[in-house]
């Protein structure tokens, strides 16, 4: 003979209400906002309570206490006005039998006086879980006396053992066999888990199930995702096997701006100086020129070494010379557009002209090096500092420091604060005296 299921009667801890609004909220929750039926006690002929009468019933309950003062702040109220009890049945129990047995038990314990008094109560039968259960909300104020409902182990009528035994007797009459034995009688000595611990475990299990479902969705086949369903087109790039030629190359002119040239194997990166090479097609296709960074070693020894490094980089099979020349022309065009046209009278200042002249003589110095000439211009460029990596054309050319210095000294006279007369103006007094001495023969060499 299988073991019988135990009677489960639970008094919800903290389920009592202390204010009028709390009673209304509790009844609306049990009725699921009017979707479920609330049934009154046997004293009221077990009639259902309409949802629009919940407020009226709640106010009548607080008035039955005789001590409820509506002017008192809710946070100062300490007296619990109701008690919330749940009667549960095993899963698979007939809903009709469970409802009838639980309603009869509530009338026997709180409406007949067998429990030591008569009380008003409301019930709500829920079947949203596997096990059917009945919610009982009891007005703790006794109808025929001045006492309050109290359920405890030491109460002569309303103790936990009496509640379970009465429930087992009534359930048996409705065809539900339940056992009302104690835990010690069943050989269970450890302390049971609390309701809070049970609900915590229940939430953790539900969370774990959700996480497992999310993992299954992430590990679903790629065909279910719209991004994976699109085919990958490898036609714009052609790969050849062997050596540094494995780099993807564009097969049409439209995709040249999307190719990022990598650093060739023959180019070292000791000094960390960057040479920027821009593709001409990128300048024509996009408003912003996309530049590819090539690491090169341009030391501070001489400009000839720097030129040799750049030429060795241009000779690599990964970077065609046509792309380098196109980048050089693009850079010179960009510099010419950046220069602002000036007339003869209102030219730029001395410092700006020195900078512009230094850039302009760069190609001439580079051309001199290619011809094999070794003049003072080349020697001075060899001792100059390496150009910054952000400049595109200064990495492969040397600046003419001597001509820039000479030009600066020539311009110092113009920028000097001492006023000078124009060519067509009158001569100064000192000049006139010098001219007169030279005419009289007095302006000879002085010893």
Curated annotation (Swiss-Prot):
- The record's top EC class is hydrolase
Q: Where is the composition biased (Low complexity)?
A: 390-406
Question: Which domain of life does the UniProt lineage start with?
Answer: Bacteria
Q: Where is this region: Disordered?
A: 214-265, 300-447
Provide ranges: composition bias, Polar residues. Answer: 251-260
What InterPro entries is this protein classified in?
Answer: Endonuclease_MobA/VirD2, VirD2
Coiled-coil spans in chain: none
Under Enzyme Commission nomenclature, its number is: 3.1.-.-
Question: What are this entry's molecular-function GO terms?
Answer: DNA binding; DNA endonuclease activity
Report whether Hydrolase shows up as a keyword of the record.
yes
Record-linked NCBIfam families = PRK13863.1 (NF010437)
Q: What is this protein called?
A: T-DNA border endonuclease VirD2
């Amino acid at each position: 003979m299988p073991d019988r299921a135990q009677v489960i009667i639970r008094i919800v801890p903290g389920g009592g209400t202390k204010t009028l609004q709390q009673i209304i909220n509790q009844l609306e929750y049990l009725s699921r906002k009017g979707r479920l039926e609330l049934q009154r006690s046997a004293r009221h002929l077990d009639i259902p309570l309409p949802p629009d009468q919940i407020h009226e019933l709640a106010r009548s309950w607080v008035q039955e206490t005789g001590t409820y003062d509506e002017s008192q702040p809710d946070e100062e109220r300490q007296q619990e006005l109701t008690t919330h009890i749940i009667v549960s049945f095993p899963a698979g129990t007939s809903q009709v039998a469970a409802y009838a047995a639980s309603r009869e038990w509530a009338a026997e314990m709180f409406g007949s006086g067998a429990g030591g008094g008569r009380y008003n109560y409301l019930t709500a039968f829920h079947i949203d879980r596997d096990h059917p259960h009945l919610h009982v909300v009891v007005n703790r104020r006794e109808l025929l006396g001045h006492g309050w409902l109290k359920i405890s182990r030491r109460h002569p009528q309303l103790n936990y053992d009496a509640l379970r035994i009465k429930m087992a007797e009534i359930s048996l009459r409705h065809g539900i066999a339940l056992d009302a034995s104690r835990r010690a009688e069943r050989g269970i000595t450890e302390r049971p888990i609390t309701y809070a611990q049970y609900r915590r475990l229940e939430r953790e299990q539900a969370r774990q199930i959700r996480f497992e479902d999310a993992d299954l969705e992430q590990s679903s086949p790629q065909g279910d995702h719209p991004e994976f369903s699109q085919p990958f087109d490898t036609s714009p790039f052609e790969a050849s096997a062997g050596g540094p030629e494995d780099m993807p190359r564009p097969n049409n002119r439209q995709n040249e701006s999307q190719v990022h040239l990598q650093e060739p194997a023959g180019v070292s990166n000791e000094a960390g100086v960057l040479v920027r090479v821009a593709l001409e097609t990128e300048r024509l296709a996009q408003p912003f020129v996309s530049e590819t960074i090539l690491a090169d070693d341009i030391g501070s020894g001489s400009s000839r070494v720097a030129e040799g490094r750049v030429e060795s980089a241009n000779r690599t099979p990964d970077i065609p010379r046509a792309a380098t020349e196109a980048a050089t022309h693009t850079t010179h065009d960009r510099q010419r557009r950046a220069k602002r046209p000036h007339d003869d009278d209102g030219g730029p200042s001395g410092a700006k002209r020195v900078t512009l002249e230094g850039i302009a003589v760069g190609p001439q110095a580079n051309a001199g090096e290619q011809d094999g000439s070794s003049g003072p211009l080349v020697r001075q460029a060899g001792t100059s500092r390496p150009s910054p990596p952000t400049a595109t054309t200064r990495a492969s050319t040397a600046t003419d420091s001597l001509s820039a210095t000479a030009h600066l000294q020539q311009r110092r006279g113009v920028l000097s604060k001492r006023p000078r007369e124009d060519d067509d103006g009158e001569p100064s007094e000192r000049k006139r005296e010098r001219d007169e001495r030279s005419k009289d023969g007095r302006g000879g060499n002085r010893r």
